């Protein structure tokens, strides 16, 4: 159960609770970590500068059911919903979730994660597939998810007001400097 999960797992443990079973997450490969830290700085910097809420990293447990907990790579919670933040586990859906799939992970793991986030009604889900160099963005609208899959172009967030990312930047090395992208995004957001 979630209470057992919280009792047994320490802050630095990399476990998810899947159908009542503790499952250790694979250590991240460098391409995953580079993209994670780049997106954390980009999305986190944007959200902080605009005062939109909070962006948290991969150590934040999100309760799916009483026997299921996920650790998304990134999540966003709007300022108006900050009361859902709990020191131990998010029992309500965040407003936006980002998951990164690395070469060593099975595609079916991503399908299960996506299904879990859909189950609890996360309004926006970005699934980044590093091996296939594709993004699958899902947006909840009137009880159903609209799905967009792409390898290039501009991906605009519905949950994070004014935020957008060029999909090709997620898959190229070196990536553009976060400070340059933030400056451009913030200028666009200023009326």
Which positions does each model-derived feature cover?
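Gly/Pro/Ser/Thr-rich low-complexity, intrinsically disordered segments predominantly at protein N-termini
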Residues: 1-191
């Amino acid at each position: 159960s979630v209470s057992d999960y919280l009792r047994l797992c320490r802050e630095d443990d990399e476990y998810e609770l899947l159908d009542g079973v503790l499952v250790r997450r694979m250590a991240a490969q460098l391409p995953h970590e580079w993209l994670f830290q780049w997106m954390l700085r980009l999305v986190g910097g944007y959200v902080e500068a605009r005062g939109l809420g909070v962006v948290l990293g991969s150590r934040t447990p999100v309760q799916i059911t009483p026997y299921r907990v996920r650790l998304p790579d990134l999540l966003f919670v709007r300022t108006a919903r900050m009361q859902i933040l709990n020191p131990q586990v998010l029992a309500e859906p965040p407003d936006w979730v980002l998951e990164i799939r690395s070469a060593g992970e099975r595609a079916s793991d991503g399908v299960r994660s996506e299904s879990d986030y859909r189950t609890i009604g996360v309004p926006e889900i970005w699934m980044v597939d590093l091996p296939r160099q594709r993004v699958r963005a899902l947006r909840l609208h009137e009880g159903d998810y609209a799905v967009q899959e792409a390898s290039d172009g501009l991906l605009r967030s519905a949950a994070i007001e004014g935020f957008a990312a060029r999909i090709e930047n997620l898959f190229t090395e070196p990536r553009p400097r976060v400070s340059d992208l933030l400056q451009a995004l913030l200028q666009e957001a200023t009326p």
